[in-house]
């Protein structure tokens, strides 16, 4: 069930327009990619389907230009419509088995897991990677369960697919996440809320290399 190309999950950017403080979304993402972001997830919880689709199309062109994967949050239809690299879902979304069936065997399927049981089930049903968190307090998602670094280590040792730590990750704690066994870190505000996303991404990328 693995994608044909091995994916680099080191620095995983999840988008959130509300953090841009007047900056342009595409320009900020491009700057972050130049700084070391290796994969981008488009998350548009407030957008209409039309806006989500148009944004995804534009972002697909950008990520293709830099040869990095575009993952779509939640919306299987958008992921298929723009031929994104994959889809990311969680416990409240489409069941993993059905998502995998509709997505096909060669697209990347990510799943948000907050327990060992969720992680094991997701792997068994076809997930290619796991987003594990929230590891630290976060303002970008209100409905998250808290996950300890010890649990992240336990999940990492129990599954064979990559693990991406998420939730309140910043320059100050990124190294802890990597040293706990995560294959990468997923960040939102640590890049997008900053005045210079490229510099923020570069500093975080350096943290991911200290394994």
Swiss-Prot record:
Binding annotation for 2-[(2R,5Z)-2-carboxy-4-methylthiazol-5(2H)-ylidene]ethyl phosphate: 138-140, 168, 188-189
Residues the record lists as binding 4-amino-2-methyl-5-(diphosphooxymethyl)pyrimidine: 41-45, 73, 112, 141
Pathway membership: Cofactor biosynthesis; thiamine diphosphate biosynthesis; thiamine phosphate from 4-amino-2-methyl-5-diphosphomethylpyrimidine and 4-methyl-5-(2-phosphoethyl)-thiazole: step 1/1
GO BP, sorted A to Z: thiamine biosynthetic process; thiamine diphosphate biosynthetic process
GO molecular function list: magnesium ion binding; thiamine-phosphate diphosphorylase activity
Catalytic activity: 2-[(2R,5Z)-2-carboxy-4-methylthiazol-5(2H)-ylidene]ethyl phosphate + 4-amino-2-methyl-5-(diphosphooxymethyl)pyrimidine + 2 H(+) = thiamine phosphate + CO2 + diphosphate; 2-(2-carboxy-4-methylthiazol-5-yl)ethyl phosphate + 4-amino-2-methyl-5-(diphosphooxymethyl)pyrimidine + 2 H(+) = thiamine phosphate + CO2 + diphosphate; 4-methyl-5-(2-phosphooxyethyl)-thiazole + 4-amino-2-methyl-5-(diphosphooxymethyl)pyrimidine + H(+) = thiamine phosphate + diphosphate
Gene Ontology CC: one annotated term: cytoplasm
CDD domains: TMP_TenI (cd00564)
NCBIfam families for the chain: thiE
Record's protein name: Thiamine-phosphate synthase
Source organism per UniProt: Alkaliphilus metalliredigens (strain QYMF)
Gene that encodes the chain: thiE
